[in-house]
A protein has these predicted regions:
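An N-terminal assembly and electron-transfer interface module characteristic of large anaerobic redox
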Residues: 15-16, 139, 143-149, 388, ...
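Short glycine-rich, Thr/Ser-proximal phosphate-binding strand/loop in the N-terminal lobe
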Residues: 23-65, 135-136, 140, 354-394, ...
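Glycine-rich phosphate-binding loop plus the immediately following alpha-helix
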Residues: 55-56, 132-173, 186, 276-279, ...
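Glycine-rich phosphate-binding loops at beta-strand->alpha-helix junctions
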Residues: 84, 219-252, 272-276, 411-414, ...
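Conserved phosphate-binding/catalytic loops in two-lobed NTP-binding clefts
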Residues: 97-100, 246-281, 425-431, 581-600, ...
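Glycine-rich phosphate-binding/hydrolytic loop that grips phosphoryl groups
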Residues: 147-152, 259-262, 266-308, 436, ...
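Adenine-nucleotide phosphate-binding core of ATP-dependent small-molecule kinases
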Residues: 185-216, 520-549
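Acidic, glycine/GT-rich loop-and beta-edge segments that sit at the periphery of enzyme/chaperone cores
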Residues: 286-349, 457, 608-675
Length: 1019
C-alpha cells in the first residue's frame, strides 16, 4: 500500500495493486445524487437516490454517511460521473468518468441486446445508439423534456408528481404542448386551463411533449428502433411517461420480470428496476479499473473539506448598502396607496373588476369614489372557474342588502371563459385595463411596465393614449413564474427566496438569459459556494435585464421617460423593484396594489361603462344563481369543416355553454362574414384550384411535389410546367398535425422553423401515396420583383431539399430530384431545365419528348406565375377599396408565402376577420407602393423586402395596421422585425408581431391583436 499526497502534503488516496475491494459509483446529476456500492462479487449492497436541491457536495457527503456501516473497514474504489459530478471529483481527487462511457459499461454487462438507450434526468437528457458504433446525443443548455420540465408542469397544475402521473393514465385526448423549455409549455398549458381543458388530458399531453422533444430534439433525425432501454428517474417513476414512449415508438413493453433476460428480437421497451441508479451502477462497474482506494474516513474527510470550498464567480453590487437604506426605500414606496373603505359600513353602488391571469386570479371591488371595498389575489391552482365562483359568492354575501354591483368587467387569459360563465357585463383587453389603473395613480404617466406570472407588458404613453405596446413572446423567462420555479426548486417559498436577496452582500451576476440557460448558471454559482441570498438578488437583476434589454430593447434609460409606473405581482418583490430602479438610475411609482392593477383597471372601466350606458345593476349571477352554478367541460373535434379543430365545450348552469379553441365562428353557430376580404383564404383557394387543374395523363409518369416553403407561391409555375410537358403532378396534402407527426422522426434539429419541419411530413405523405419520383428543387434566387438589392431566398427555403435527402431514409429508393434552378433568368432557366430533363430521360426515368414541347411548357409556366401575381394584386386592390368604402380596419398580415398554410398560421387570419378586419398579404401591399423605403440593412431577400414595403404601405394609410407573423427559429426575421418596426414607428404606426410555431393555442396572439386594435382605435 502506498499513501498518495499532493504538493501541500495533504492525503488524497491510497494506491493498491490487485486487491479485492468494494466499488462505489457516484452519479451527480443536475437535480439528484445517486450512489451504488458493489461488493467484491459485483452484487449491489447499497443504493440511494435523493434530490440535492443544488447543495451538491453536502448532499453527497450526507448520502455516503448513511453507508458508513455498510462500508465498514473495507477499502473502496470510487468513480464519479454526471453533469454536476466533475466539481466534486476535482476537489476530492476522485476519478471522474464521462457518463456515456459508464452507461455503456452497464449496458454491456446487463443488457447486451440493447440497440438504444434513452435516459432522462433532472435537467439532462441523452440518447445513446449502439448500432454501427457508439453514438451519443445529449441536450445542450436546454432542460426541456427532462425531469425539471415535469416538475415545473406539476407546479403549474398544482398537483404532485404522483398525482400528475395518475391523471395522465385517465387521459382521453392529447393536446399539443411545447417541451423545448418549461416557459414555452406554460404559455400553451395556461390557456388550456383557462378554457376548461381537463387536467387528465393536459397531464398526458405533458408526457407526450417530453416524448416529442426526445424524438426531434435529441434523436435529431436518426430513427429510434430495436430494443430500447429506458433509464433515469422520470422514466422509472412516471408510468404515464413510459406509456407515451411505448405507444409513440410502437414498442412492446417487457414485463419487469423479463427485463433481465436476453432478447432474441428487436422492438422491445425495457424499463429495468435499476433505472434510477443505472448510471451510478455503471460508474461502480468502471471503478474496478481504478488503482485508487479509500477508507470511509478518507472519503468523509475529503467531502467535508470540499463542502467549504468556493470558486470564482462574478458578483454585482448589493441591492441595499444597509438596513437604513432599505427602510428609506420602503417608506418611499408605501406612499403610493389606493384608497380603501370598510365594506361593512359602506352602502351604495359598487364596481367589480376581475383579472383572470395566466397564473393568478385577482378581484377588486371599488366604491363610487374609487376606493377599494374588497380585493383578492391567489394562484389559479389550475382551475380559475372554481376560484372565481367562490369569490363571487363571497362578494354577494358581503354586498347583501346594502351594496348594489352596478357593473362588472373581466380581463386576462381567462376573460372569455369567466365572462360567459358568470354573465360579466364587459370584457376588456389587458393592456387597456392596466393603462387605466396606472393613470389613476399618475395621470401624467408616460411609461408602464407590468411583469406578471408569464407576461411582460410595456406601454409607452403619448398624448394621454398608448403609443406603443411591447410584449414578451411565448417565452416567459424573467416573469413571476421564472422566480417561482427557482424558489421551489431550491426548497423555498417565493417570499422566503425574495427576502433572502434583500440583504445579499454579493449578488451573483447571472446575465439575462432564458430560464433553462439560467439553471446552468445557478448550478455553477452554487457549486462555487454562492448563498441563496446571492442567487436571489442575482435573479432579481436578471429579471430586470430581461425586461429592459430583451423586451423593451432600450439603448438608454432616458427612453423610458420621467413618469414610470411599475405593476404586476412580480414587482411586489422589493428585490426586483430595487434592481429595476438601480438599472435605470431613477425612482419609479409602485402602487401598493401592484399585483391587483389589472383587476383595479377593470373596476375603473366598469365604472366608466356604467356611467356612459346608465347601468343601474350588473347582469352578473345572483347569489341564488351562484349557489346553483355548475360547470363541466369536454374536449372534442369540430366537424363543421375539413380542419376538424380541437375545441373545448364548457357547459354551465341554465344550459349556457362556452366553446374555446375554435379558429372560426362556425362552432358558435355564427356564419362567417364571407364578404370581408381575406387574402389568406383567397390565396389558399387559388393554390387548391391550381392543384386540381391541368390535364391528367393516365398511364404516364407522375411526379410528386411537397407543398411548402418555396413551392407554395411557385406552385402555379411548377404545376403548369410539368402538366404541359405531359407529366402528371401529384402535390402533397395540405399540412396538418398528423402530417407533421409522420415526419417528425427525421427532423434533425428542434430549432428549425415549423414550416421546414413540415417538409419532412410532406415527403412522407408523397411516399405514402406510392410516388417514386419527387421533384423539389433548390433555389438560391427567387423571381426578381425589382424591390430589393438582390432577390435571394433564405438558406432554409433555398436548400432544405439537401437536408431532406441526407436525413430521410425513406428517400433511399426514391428518385428525389433536387436540381439547382434560378427562375429569375428565363433564358438560363430554360437551358438548365432542358439539361436536367434530358438527364432524367437518359437515366430512363422520363420518356423522351421534343425539346420544343419543353420550351413551350416553360413559356406557359412563366405566364401562369405572372397571372398568379396579377390576380393577387387585383385582389389586394379590391380589399383596400372594400376597407375604405366600408370604414373597415385594413390589416396587412405579413409573413412568407407559406404562412397561408392553416397548420402554420393556426387561423390567425380568421381571428382578425372575426374582429371585422380586412386582410391583405405582404406581396399585394408591396406591389401597391410607388417607391420602396430606405433601409439600414442590406435589402437582398425577396420575401423580406416585401415586409419593408408593406410597412411603408401601412405608414401611408390611416386605416391600415401592420401585423407580422414570425416563425420561431427564423434567424433572418431577427433583423427584419427591427427594420419594419423602425419604418412604422417613425410614421407613428404600431408594429405588432405574432410568433408562431407548432403550438396552435391563440390565447396570447388574441391579446396582442386586441391590444393593437384597441390602441390604434384610440389614436
Amino acid at each position: 500500500m502506498v499513501m498518495l499526497l499532493n504538493k501541500s502534503g495533504d492525503f488524497f488516496g491510497r494506491l493498491y495493486i490487485n486487491k479485492m475491494i468494494y466499488k462505489m459509483g457516484i452519479d451527480i446529476g443536475s437535480t439528484t445524487v445517486k450512489i451504488v456500492i458493489l461488493d467484491e462479487n459485483d452484487e449491489i449492497i447499497y443504493k440511494c437516490y435523493d434530490r440535492h436541491l443544488s447543495q451538491v457536495r453536502a448532499k453527497t457527503a450526507e448520502l455516503i454517511e448513511l453507508a458508513e456501516n455498510i462500508i465498514g473497514d473495507n477499502e473502496i474504489k470510487i468513480t464519479v460521473t454526471g453533469s454536476a459530478g466533475q466539481g466534486v471529483a476535482q476537489t476530492c481527487g476522485f476519478e471522474f468518468v464521462q457518463e456515456v462511457f459508464v452507461t455503456g459499461e452497464m449496458v454491456k454487462k446487463y443488457y447486451p441486446e440493447t440497440d438504444c438507450v434513452i435516459e432522462l434526468g433532472g435537467e439532462d437528457a441523452k440518447i445513446i445508439f449502439f448500432n454501427g458504433g457508439l453514438e451519443e446525443r445529449m441536450n445542450g443548455s436546454c432542460a426541456g423534456g427532462t425531469g425539471a420540465f415535469i416538475d415545473q408542469m406539476s407546479l403549474l397544475l398544482d398537483v404532485s408528481n404522483e398525482e400528475l402521473d395518475k391523471l395522465s393514465l385517465k387521459a382521453e385526448k392529447i393536446h399539443t404542448i411545447a417541451s423545448r423549455c418549461g416557459v414555452f409549455a406554460k404559455s400553451d398549458i395556461q390557456p388550456l386551463l383557462n378554457q376548461g381543458a381537463k387536467k387528465e388530458n393536459i397531464a398526458a399531453s405533458i408526457f407526450q411533449a417530453v416524448v416529442d422533444q426526445t424524438i426531434t430534439g435529441l434523436a435529431q433525425g436518426r430513427d429510434i428502433t430495436g430494443n430500447i432501454l429506458f433509464l433515469g428517474g422520470p422514466l422509472y417513476f412516471f408510468e404515464g411517461l413510459r406509456k407515451r414512449f411505448t405507444e409513440t415508438l410502437k414498442l412492446s413493453e417487457l414485463p419487469p420480470s423479463l427485463s433481465d433476460t436476453p432478447l432474441e428480437e428487436g422492438g422491445y421497451a425495457i424499463f429495468p428496476e435499476i433505472a434510477p441508479y443505472a448510471v451510478a451502477l455503471g460508474a461502480a462497474i468502471s471503478a474496478d479499473s481504478s488503482n485508487f482506494l479509500y477508507k470511509y474516513d478518507d472519503i468523509a474527510a475529503l467531502l467535508n473539506k470540499s463542502v467549504s470550498m468556493s470558486g470564482n464567480i462574478r458578483h454585482g453590487e448589493p441591492l441595499f448598502k444597509n438596513e437604513e437604506e432599505y427602510n428609506e426605500f420602503k417608506t418611499r414606496h408605501s406612499k403610493e396607496k389606493a384608497g380603501e373603505t370598510d365594506i361593512d359600513t359602506y352602502g351604495g353602488g359598487a364596481y367589480l373588476g376581475i383579472d383572470c391571469g395566466s397564473t393568478t386570479t385577482k378581484i377588486v371591488m371599488i366604491s363610487e369614489d374609487y376606493k377599494i371595498l374588497y380585493n383578492y389575489y391567489a394562484a389559479n391552482a389550475g382551475n380559475p372557474v372554481d376560484i372565481v365562483l367562490a369569490q363571487l359568492k363571497r362578494v354577494r354575501e358581503l354586498c347583501a342588502g346594502k351594496i348594489t354591483i352596478k357593473s362588472a368587467a373581466v380581463t386576462g387569459y381567462g376573460e372569455e371563459l369567466i365572462r360567459n360563465a358568470f354573465s360579466i357585463d364587459f370584457g376588456i383587453v389587458e393592456t387597456i385595463a392596466h393603462f387605466k389603473a396606472a393613470k389613476y395613480f399618475n395621470p401624467n404617466v408616460n411609461f408602464i411596465l407590468d411583469i406578471g406570472g408569464q407576461d411582460i407588458k410595456c406601454f409607452k404613453i403619448k398624448n394621454n393614449a398608448i403609443d406603443n405596446i411591447m410584449l414578451n413572446e411565448a417565452c416567459s423567462s424573467g416573469c413571476g413564474s421564472f422566480i417561482e420555479s427557482f424558489a421551489k426548486s431550491m426548497g423555498y417559498t417565493v417570499e422566503e427566496f425574495c427576502k433572502a436577496g434583500i440583504y445579499a452582500e454579493n449578488p451573483v451576476d447571472l446575465g439575462s438569459r432564458c430560464t433553462v440557460f439560467m439553471n446552468s448558471s445557478v448550478k455553477q454559482a452554487q457549486k462555487e459556494g454562492a448563498s441563496i441570498g446571492d442567487i436571489s438578488a442575482g435573479l432579481s437583476m436578471s429579471v430586470v435585464k430581461n425586461a429592459l434589454y430583451k423586451v423593451i430593447r432600450i439603448h438608454d434609460a432616458s427612453e423610458l421617460g420621467e413618469n414610470i409606473v411599475v405593476q404586476g405581482g412580480t414587482f411586489l418583490n422589493d428585490a426586483i423593484l430595487r434592481a429595476f430602479e438601480k438599472a435605470i438610475e431613477r425612482e419609479v411609482i409602485r402602487p401598493n396594489i401592484s399585483g391587483l392593477m389589472g383587476a383595479f383597471g377593470c373596476a375603473v372601466y366598469a365604472r366608466e361603462k356604467s356611467t356612459t350606458q346608465n347601468l343601474q345593476e350588473s347582469a352578473i349571477l345572483s347569489a341564488d344563481e351562484l349557489n346553483a352554478f355548475s360547470h363541466s367541460s369536454q374536449t372534442t373535434n369540430c366537424g363543421l369543416c375539413a380542419n376538424k379543430c380541437s375545441i373545448t365545450v364548457n357547459k354551465f348552469s341554465n344550459n349556457k355553454r362556452f366553446i374555446s379553441g375554435n379558429k372560426c365562428e362556425r362552432p358558435l353557430g355564427i356564419r362567417e362574414n364571407e364578404k370581408i376580404p381575406n387574402m389568406y383564404h383567397f390565396k389558399l383557394d387559388y393554390i387548391k384550384s391550381v392543384i386540381n387543374s391541368g390535364q391528367k395523363y393516365p398511364g404516364r409518369k407522375t411526379v410528386g411535389m411537397p407543398l411548402g416553403l418555396n413551392t407554395y407561391e411557385m406552385l402555379p409555375f411548377w404545376h403548369s410546367l410539368w402538366s404541359n410537358i405531359g407529366i402528371n403532378i401529384q402535390v402533397s396534402d395540405i399540412s396538418s398535425r398528423e402530417l407533421y407527426q409522420i415526419g417528425q422522426h427525421s427532423i434533425p434539429s428542434d430549432t428549425i422553423c415549423y414550416p421546414a419541419k413540415l417538409m419532412h411530413g410532406h415527403i412522407e405523405n408523397l411516399i405514402g401515396k406510392n410516388i417514386t419520383d419527387i421533384f423539389y428543387p433548390c433555389m438560391t434566387y427567387n423571381f426578381d420583383e425589382k424591390i430589393s438589392d438582390n432577390h435571394y431566398n433564405c438558406p432554409v427555403v433555398a436548400y432544405y431539399p439537401e437536408l431532406l435527402q441526407s436525413n430521410m431514409s425513406g428517400l433511399q429508393n426514391i428518385n428525389f430530384m433536387m436540381p439547382y434552378f434560378d427562375v429569375s433568368n428565363k433564358r438560363a432557366f430554360t437551358k438548365k431545365f432542358t439539361q436536367f430533363f434530358n438527364e432524367q430521360v437518359a437515366a430512363g426515368r422520363f420518356d423522351a419528348i421534343h425539346m420544343k414541347t419543353v420550351k413551350t411548357a416553360i413559356d406557359k409556366a412563366y405566364k401562369s406565375q405572372d397571372l398568379y401575381f396579377e390576380v393577387m394584386l387585383a385582389e389586394g386592390e379590391r380589399a383596400v377599396k372594400f376597407a375604405g368604402e366600408n370604414n373597415s380596419r385594413l390589416i396587412v398580415l405579413c409573413g412568407r408565402p407559406y404562412h397561408i398554410d392553416p397548420e402554420i398560421n393556426h387561423g390567425i387570419d380568421k381571428m382578425l376577420n372575426s374582429f371585422g378586419c380586412v386582410i391583405i398579404t405582404e406581396d399585394a401591399a408591396s406591389a401597391m407602393i410607388k417607391s420602396k423605403p430606405k433601409t439600414k440593412v442590406l435589402n437582398q431577400w425577396t420575401y423580406h423586402a416585401r415586409l419593408y414595403n408593406s410597412a411603408e404601405f401601412v405608414s401611408k394609410r390611416e386605416n391600415a395596421e401592420f401585423v407580422q407573423l414570425v416563425s420561431f427559429g427564423c434567424g433572418i426575421d431577427a433583423i427584419t422585425t427591427d427594420e419594419a418596426r423602425e419604418i412604422l414607428e417613425k410614421n407613428s404606426k404600431l408594429y405588432t408581431q405574432i410568433k408562431i410555431d407548432e403550438i396552435n393555442n391563440l390565447g396570447a396572439a388574441k391579446i396582442r391583436v386586441r391590444s393593437m386594435l384597441a390602441v390604434s382605435g384610440e389614436k
